[in-house]
Amino acid sequence: MACGLVASNLNLKPGECLRVRGEVTPDAKSFVLNLGKASNNLCLHFNPRFNAHGDANTIVCNSKDGGAWGTEQREAVFPFQPGSVAEVCITFDQTNLTIKLPDGYEFKFPNRLNLEAINYMAADGDFKIKCVAFD
C-alpha cells in the first residue's frame, strides 16, 4: 500500500500520547493510521471506513504480526464527518492501546505484539494530516 506519510524511529513509550490531527476529505471513503515496529509488524491498524470494503461508518482495528493479519475488531461509534477536522489520540501500555476519538469516546485494542515502544507510523487514505504531536 502506498502511504501518504511514513515516519520511523518515533520511540513512543508506554503512557505517552500520539496525537494526529487532520482534515477528512469531503468525499472520504476510508483512511488508515498504522502504528507498530515496521510495516509488517503493526500493533494497531486503525481504519475508519465511511463506505469501504463492505463497511459503512465503522472503525475497523487490527494488528499485523510478521505480515499476518490478526482478528479484526469493529467499533460502531463513528464521530468522523467528511469535510471536517478530526483529532485522534493514541496511548499504549503492555496490555492495550487506548484510542480517544474526536467526540471524546475511548476504546481499547489489545497490544497483541507486546511492544515496549512504537517506532513506526504510516498514514494513508482520505485524511490530510495537519499535525502530529507527542505528549
UniProtKB/Swiss-Prot annotation:
- Quote one Gene Ontology molecular function term: laminin binding
- Record Pfam families: Gal-bind_lectin (PF00337)
Any single GO CC term annotated in Swiss-Prot or TrEMBL for this entry: extracellular space
Q: Which PROSITE patterns match?
A: GALECTIN
Keyword Acetylation attached: yes
Annotated residues for binding of a beta-D-galactoside: 45-49, 53, 62, 69-72
Gene3D superfamilies cross-referenced by the UniProt entry: 2.60.120.200
* InterPro entries for the chain: ConA-like_dom_sf, Galectin-like, Galectin_CRD
Q: How does it assemble?
A: Homodimer. Binds LGALS3BP. Interacts with CD2, CD3, CD4, CD6, CD7, CD43, ALCAM and CD45. Interacts with laminin (via poly-N-acetyllactosamine). Interacts with SUSD2.
Name of the molecule in the record: Galectin-1
The species is Pongo abelii
